[in-house]
Amino acid sequence: KYDERILHEVTLESIKDYRETGAIPASFEKAGPKESIFFEPAKTKVAIVTCGGICPGLNNVIRALVNQLVYRYGITRILGIRYGYEGLIPKYNHPVIELTAPMVSDIYQSGGTILGTSRGNQDVEQMVNTLEILNINVLFCIGGDGTLRGAHAIYKEIEKRKLRIAVAGIPKTIDNDIDLMQKSFGFETAFSIANDI
C-alpha cells in the first residue's frame, strides 16, 4: 500500500497534539517492494550523484544501488553525475559516466567516491534543465543535510514544471546531523576511528 507511513515520533503526547491540531505527523513512506512501480524499468534512466564531504561507505552505496537497479529492477541505463551538483551545470563541463554492474563490482575496495564530489549551491533551474536533456527519470542524491536540501529544491522545481522525474535522497554524513535519522552511514566508522585516537 502506498499510503502506509512510518511515524517518526510515536509518543502519546505527540499523537494527542497531532489529533488536536489536525497537523500531519512527520513520517516516512514504508520501505520495501510495492505492488506496482511508476516507471517501466526497461525505459527508465537513472542518475546517481554524490555531494559534500566524503565518508566511509560511499562507494559501497553506489555499488549496492547499481546492483539493485540492474538485478532487481532490470534497469540498465544508469548514469553517474561527476563532482556533485556541479556535474548538472553545463559550464563546468563534467562528463557523466555510464555505471554498470561489472564497472562497480570492486569499487567498495576504494575510499571516497568514484563519482567525485563538490560543495556549494548550484542553480536549480539549470540542474533540472540538465536532467531533462539527459532524459533522467530518477535521480538519487547521496549526501548530508546540504545535499538533501538541494535534492528538495530540485524536487520543487520538477514539481513546478510538472515533470515526471523522481528524486530520492540517501543520507550520508559523518556528523550524524540529519533530522529524523538515528544514524547515517559514515558516522559509525568516523566515531570508532575517533574513539581509537
Each model region followed by its residue ranges:
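Short, acidic/small-residue loops that bind anionic groups at enzyme active sites
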Residues: Y155-S184, E188-I193
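Short glycine-rich or small-residue beta-strand-to-loop segments that form or flank ligand, phosphate
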Residues: K45-C55, T113-G116, N137-G143, G169
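Short Gly/Thr/Asp-enriched flexible loops that form oxyanion-binding sites at enzyme active sites
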Residues: V61-L65, G146-I165
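Short, ordered loop/turn segments at secondary-structure junctions
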Residues: C51-G53, G80-E86, R119-G120, G144-T147, ...
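Glycine-rich, mobile lid/loop segments that gate access to catalytic sites or pores
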Residues: L131-T147, Y155-K156, A166, I174
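Glycine-rich oxoanion-binding loops at beta->alpha junctions
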Residues: Y2-F39, E86-L139, I174, K183-D196
